[in-house]
């Protein structure tokens, strides 16, 4: 049996007990055929092109972790109809130096969430715009998780079966997408 494909998970919220982090962990548990690793972004210094010739160790670590993965999953809350600043910074750090983006050709998916009913629609679409520009082949199926604060029990476990079923289906679609992109990898990287 072959090794499961690895997925770097970038969680947009920095809060230790964030609902985004809980959702990322629940998604990983519901998608057992993939290996998920959360890549921390909270310690990344702000992107500054002046630092590219001698990049901070945190940038180097982040870029290596993303580059080593077969795919990337973004799980993000919505802040002011967009993505959190820390997530945008991580995207910028990974996109540099010019011509060496760790995102290029790496299959991806986006899950957005919010306490309201629209599930982070604005964040999801803003993030997708950046990722398409960076040549991340994104799963076309979109995932908006609304009323996110009501989905978890006191111990952080996902208690909403409808959401669990949706995430299982999304995980199956993402897994198939990763396989499809891996089969077409030379063409995707050349784009």
Residue ranges of model-derived segments:
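Glycine-rich phosphate/pyrophosphate-binding loop and the adjoining helix
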Residues: 2-4, 8, 137-191
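Helix-loop-strand module that forms the ligand-binding subsite of alpha/beta enzymes
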Residues: 55-134
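N-terminal beta1-alpha1 ligand-phosphate binding loop
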Residues: 2-33
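N-terminal beta-loop-helix "entrance" segment that forms/cooperates
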Residues: 40-58, 154
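A generic structural motif
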Residues: 31-37, 136
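A general structural signal for well-ordered alpha-helical segments in protein cores
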Residues: 7, 20, 24, 44, ...
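Short connector loops at secondary-structure junctions
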Residues: 37-46, 143-150
